[in-house]
Regions:
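N-terminal Lys/Arg-rich, disordered targeting/topogenic segments
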Residues: 1-15
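Hydrophobic membrane-insertion alpha-helices, especially the h-region
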Residues: 18-31
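Membrane-interface motif at the C-terminal end of an N-terminal transmembrane signal
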Residues: 28-43
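Penicillin-recognizing serine hydrolase domain
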Residues: 39-94, 100-101, 161-167, 185-372
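Short, conserved catalytic-motif segment at the N-terminal edge
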Residues: 97-109
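Active-site SXXK
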Residues: 98, 112-140, 147, 254
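Short, well-structured active-site flanking segments
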Residues: 127-145, 233-234, 265-276
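Signal peptide-directed extracytoplasmic domains
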Residues: 143-170
Length: 372
């Protein structure tokens, strides 16, 4: 009898323990759900504030970070990006009235421009050649040897002549390094007042001699841009093509550069008229005389690509290890232009996703240059 009573007590105690355990689990689950609910509400509130900022905050000729540094990753993840561990991620949107509409990134961080450095070089080249007939042919020389073997190239042949406009097209559309070097040579010679086709690199140059020419030309371009368009000391181009990861710039200087391109309509027209081309046939002087079909490296211009976006007009992709960059202009249906810079991402997909998202926000006026 006593044994049965003890068994019942044990069973009763076991039931009580199970009930308490169950209640505890329920309370914990409820707590987690409530925590997630509150957290989601906070996140939703932050996103609404973010949307509000995108609509109303226009920063005239100045740079300001809307989101705090510790919020950057969280908000980017909301868009669906994954490879965002690079501390140098930065993106911005600005309109054709030279207003910075939206910016996110760290103040004072240096950016590796990669192939976007070609735009810096082209601004220098087109500035020097502004009164020169770009339908004229110029001769490729020893400078094409300066282009890295693993870099993009148009296949220029030493001694052959090419239209300047074709060189510009290949530099922008397929990121041709050899064309960039030939353009740099003729601009440098014209600026110095010497015969335009004069070689800047002697025959049979050593590796050190080639490096010195690249260094000297790059230093000249950097100094020119600092003086002409007031780039800061943050910008230091060490190779006209951007193939070296030692080239540096900043998002402030990127903005200044784009502002200069926007304010100089001829410059903008010259660069964009090439950058907006998805594919084009250039003259028979390229390669074996049969001409060459160029396909733009910007996926947003390729109608066969899933990234294709009507209204995108170049400008430039840039890729080095750990640096996937895209420097684009989007033309909205109302005729307004928007410059979009996305730099420092670890993979090309993230750059494309973010650019696509920013374009979507421009279209539906989540980013609105008339917000004020």
């Amino acid at each position: 009898m006593k044994k049965n009573i003890n068994v019942r007590k044990i069973n009763k105690r076991s039931i009580v323990i199970k009930i308490i355990f169950f209640i505890t689990i329920v309370v914990i689950i409820y707590g987690i759900l409530e925590f997630n609910k509150i957290n989601n509400e906070k996140n939703s509130s932050r996103l609404l504030e973010w949307e509000k900022s995108l609509k109303t905050n226009i920063f005239h000729a100045r740079v300001k970070t809307i989101l705090k540094e510790d919020e950057i990753k969280e908000n980017i993840q909301k868009i669906g990006l994954t490879g965002i561990n690079n501390k140098n991620i930065f993106f911005s949107v600005y309109d054709n009235n030279e207003n910075i509409i939206y910016k996110i990134g760290k103040d004072g961080e240096n950016i590796v421009p990669a192939s976007i450095a070609k735009i810096y070089t082209l601004v220098y080249v087109l500035d020097i050649l502004k009164d020169y007939d770009k339908e004229k042919k110029v001769k490729a020389g020893n400078e094409i040897e300066l282009n890295s073997k693993d870099a993009s190239a148009a296949g220029l042949i030493k001694g052959k002549e090419y239209k300047i406009n074709d060189l510009i097209s290949s530099a922008v559309i397929i990121s041709a390094g050899d064309s960039v070097y030939t353009l740099t040579k003729i601009a440098y010679n014209l600026e110095k007042g010497i015969e335009i086709n004069t070689d800047i690199l002697k025959n049979n140059s050593t590796k050190d001699e080639k490096s010195k020419v690249v260094s000297d030309i790059s230093e000249h371009i950097t100094k020119y841009l600092r003086k002409k368009i007031k780039l800061s000391d943050d910008t230091n181009i060490t190779d006209p093509t951007g193939i070296l990861n030692t080239s540096k710039t900043s998002y402030k200087d990127m903005y200044i550069l784009m502002k200069y391109i926007y304010s100089n309509k001829d410059k903008m027209k010259e660069i964009i008229s090439n950058a907006e081309t998805a594919e084009m046939q250039i003259s028979g002087d390229f390669l074996s005389g049969k001409g060459q079909k160029l396909t733009n490296t910007n996926p947003f211009l390729n109608k066969k690509s899933s990234w294709y976006e009507d209204g995108v007009v170049g400008l430039k992709t840039g890729t080095l290890r750990g640096w996937n960059n895209l420097f684009s202009i989007f033309k909205k249906s109302d005729g307004n232009y928007y410059g979009i810079i996305t730099v420092g991402f670890e993979n090309r997909k993230d750059v494309n996703m973010l650019t696509k998202e920013l374009i979507r926000r421009i279209k539906n006026e989540s980013i609105n240059s008339k917000g004020n």
